């Protein structure tokens, strides 16, 4: 089982704020996510600028595309994104359109499982050639005190068994990682737990050490 990668989510409102994070920890992570908040705040230039600064890193545009899949994904890929996200409630043709464009750029598409989705949809995504999904505990659910539970673990295992590369996100803390041991997680996303740590560098390194210990 390969080691899960570590992704930092830049849900900053400005590039200036995002740079405060990346200048510290960009070399400690595998993937740099231009979060939805930053995409809205700064547009695709955020993707272009971060990829220019860190060409050796995977840069994800978390656009959460809901419609106009070909148009919006092309905007992201032309800004040199490596991956883009499509929201799970989008029509299957939106996901297919985004994937068609991704292939032109040797990129990839992730289905963001935020909110309601079904296993029937999951099979449609697989049948369409989608390889990646993001299992997401929402920011608002976290704020309401919703913790990771057995239902989450069961769903993540099932997605993995279907052949998806599963990314896990949603207020992940270091102490949450053992919950997922034994599952071939593709990526763990840490946002505030790294960005807001007293030492973001040490926080990122602790995540990497824990991943190596649990999956190595």
Swiss-Prot record:
GO BP field: 'de novo' pyrimidine nucleobase biosynthetic process; L-ascorbic acid catabolic process
Signal peptide (residue range): none
SMART domains: OMPdecase
Reactions accelerated catalytically: 3-dehydro-L-gulonate 6-phosphate + H(+) = L-xylulose 5-phosphate + CO2
Keyword Heme: no
UniProt: Mg(2+) binding residues: 33, 62
Alphabetized UniProt keyword annotations: Carbohydrate metabolism, Decarboxylase, Lyase, Magnesium, Metal-binding
Family stated for the protein in its record: Belongs to the HPS/KGPDC family. KGPDC subfamily.
Oligomer status and interactors: Homodimer.
Protein task: Catalyzes the decarboxylation of 3-keto-L-gulonate-6-P into L-xylulose-5-P. Is involved in the anaerobic L-ascorbate utilization.
Descriptive protein name: 3-keto-L-gulonate-6-phosphate decarboxylase UlaD
Organism: Escherichia fergusonii (strain ATCC 35469 / DSM 13698 / CCUG 18766 / IAM 14443 / JCM 21226 / LMG 7866 / NBRC 102419 / NCTC 12128 / CDC 0568-73)
């Amino acid at each position: 089982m390969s080691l899960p990668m570590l992704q930092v989510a830049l849900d900053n409102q400005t590039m200036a704020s995002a740079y405060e994070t990346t200048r510290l920890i960009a070399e400690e992570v595998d993937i740099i996510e231009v979060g939805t908040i930053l995409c809205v705040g700064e547009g695709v230039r955020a993707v272009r600028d971060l990829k220019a600064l860190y060409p050796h890193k995977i840069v994800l545009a978390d656009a959460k595309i809901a419609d106009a899949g070909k148009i919006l994904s092309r905007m992201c890929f032309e800004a040199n994104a490596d991956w883009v996200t499509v929201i799970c409630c989008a029509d299957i043709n939106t996901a297919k359109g985004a994937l068609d464009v991704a292939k032109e750029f040797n990129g990839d598409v992730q289905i963001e499982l935020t909110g309601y989705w079904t296993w029937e949809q999951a099979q449609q995504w697989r049948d369409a050639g989608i390889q990646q999904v993001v299992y997401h505990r929402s920011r608002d659910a976290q704020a309401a005190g919703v913790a990771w539970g057995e239902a989450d673990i069961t769903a993540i295992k099932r997605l993995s068994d279907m052949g998806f590369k599963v990314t896990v996100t949603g207020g992940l803390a270091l102490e949450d990682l053992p919950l997922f041991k034994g599952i071939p997680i593709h990526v763990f996303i840490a946002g505030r737990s790294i960005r807001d740590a007293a030492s973001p560098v040490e926080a990122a390194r602790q995540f990497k050490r824990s991943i190596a210990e649990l999956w190595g």
